[in-house]
Amino acid sequence: MYGIEYTTFLIYLISIILFNYILKSITRMMDYIIYKFLLIVTIASIVVNAQNYGINLPITGSMDASYVNATKDKPFLTSTLCLYYPTEARTEINDNEWTSTLSQLFLTKGWPTGSVYFKEYDDIATFSVDPQLYCDYNIVLMRYNSSLELDMSELANLILNEWLCNPMDITLYYYQQNGQANKWIAMGQSCTIKVCPLNTQTLGIGCQTTNTRTFEEVATAEKLVITDVVDGVNHKLDVTTATCTIRNCKKLGPRENVAVIQVGGADILDITSDPTTAPQTERMMRINWKKWWQVFYTIVDYVNQIVQAMSKRSRSLNSAAFYYRV
């Protein structure tokens, strides 16, 4: 009897000792893993020169007063820069080697030959139909034209922000906008958009749903339209679908790898007053109009200051990708 009790006691004692040994082994192993992980993180944080994406620096106003002409210490050896300019710039310069000249000048600012691409567009309206922003950094030059202020403002709003878009079937469904970030964006050769707000009984408010001539016209024969209507109210739409495509879009936030430079004009276009723009600063600036050579020289001088206010983390943009997610 006593032998059985002693045996049971020994079994319990051995089990406790074995369990304690296993627990200590696991503890030592976990300590080793944790210490090794912390060591790797510490070394990586010292070696890696990470970029802070949380800062969106304003670069509005005149460059002559706000920026210092200097070359960035670390050239962008692995980055690409696209410079978009209107056809009138090439026409005025009238020099077949002008892009080569500018490439050599960009080299003095730390941009290797072949890293800067020159992209030409016909005019603001045409560019807005098919914007293609593929480089790590994209600088868009827009010559100010008082008759095109709306087009310039809408194009800037489009390319300076990221949008999540879905198709709209206006023949079958009514649509409403939910929140200030929700817009209807239309692109095409000719976009005419009419809307008819509806009450809770789906009857037109000031219009007849069966007669599009009574609808409220919000855009006429435009190539790019960002439509904003009263939130929370269903609308029936009439769109020239043969020459225009409309999407239901939500503004996600700033597209940080794009900057817009307004060339000339008394005042800079201000899209920051839009309540959907957060933070209330954008990568827009103005430089005084003289000659296109002078404009490009100014860009070369300040290119690194411009890029420092940007981030190359944003997605590329073209019209096809824009319709689904940009």
UniProtKB/Swiss-Prot annotation:
Which pairs of positions does the record mark as disulfide bonds?
A: 82-135, 165-249, 191-244, 196-207
- Residue intervals passing through the bilayer: none
**Ranges where the record places region GPR motif:** 253-255
Q: Which GO terms describe its molecular function?
A: metal ion binding
The entry's family comment says: Belongs to the rotavirus VP7 family.
Coiled-coil positions = none
The entry's comment on post-translational modification says: N-glycosylated.
Q: Which residues bind Ca(2+) 2?
A: 177, 228-229, 231, 301
Q: What is this protein called?
A: Outer capsid glycoprotein VP7
According to the record's subunit comment, the protein's assembly and interactions are:
Homotrimer; disulfide-linked. 2 Ca(2+) ions bound at each subunit interface in the trimer hold the trimer together. Interacts with the intermediate capsid protein VP6. Interacts with the outer capsid protein VP5*.
Region (LVD motif), start-end ranges: 237-239
Q: Which residues form the signal peptide?
A: 1-50
The UniProt record gives the binding positions of Ca(2+) 1 as 95, 206, 214, 216
| Taxonomic source organism | Rotavirus A (isolate RVA/Cow/Thailand/61A/1988/G10P7[5])
- Chain intervals for the UniProt region annotation (CNP motif): 165-167
Domain of life according to the entry:
Viruses
The entry's function note states:
Calcium-binding protein that interacts with rotavirus cell receptors once the initial attachment by VP4 has been achieved. Rotavirus attachment and entry into the host cell probably involves multiple sequential contacts between the outer capsid proteins VP4 and VP7, and the cell receptors. Following entry into the host cell, low intracellular or intravesicular Ca(2+) concentration probably causes the calcium-stabilized VP7 trimers to dissociate from the virion. This step is probably necessary for the membrane-disrupting entry step and the release of VP4, which is locked onto the virion by VP7.
Mind telling me which HAMAP family this protein's record contains? Answer: Rota_VP7, Rota_VP7_A
Its main subcellular localisation, reduced to a broad class, is virion
Something else known? Some rotavirus strains are neuraminidase-sensitive and require sialic acid to attach to the cell surface. Some rotavirus strains are integrin-dependent. Some rotavirus strains depend on ganglioside for their entry into the host cell. Hsp70 also seems to be involved in the entry of some strains. In group A rotaviruses, VP7 defines the G serotype.
Q: Which UniProt keywords apply?
A: Calcium, Capsid protein, Disulfide bond, Glycoprotein, Host endoplasmic reticulum, Host-virus interaction, Metal-binding, Outer capsid protein, Signal, T=13 icosahedral capsid protein, Virion
Q: Which GO terms describe its cellular component?
A: host cell endoplasmic reticulum lumen; T=13 icosahedral viral capsid; viral outer capsid
The record, for InterPro entries, names: VP7, VP7_1, VP7_2
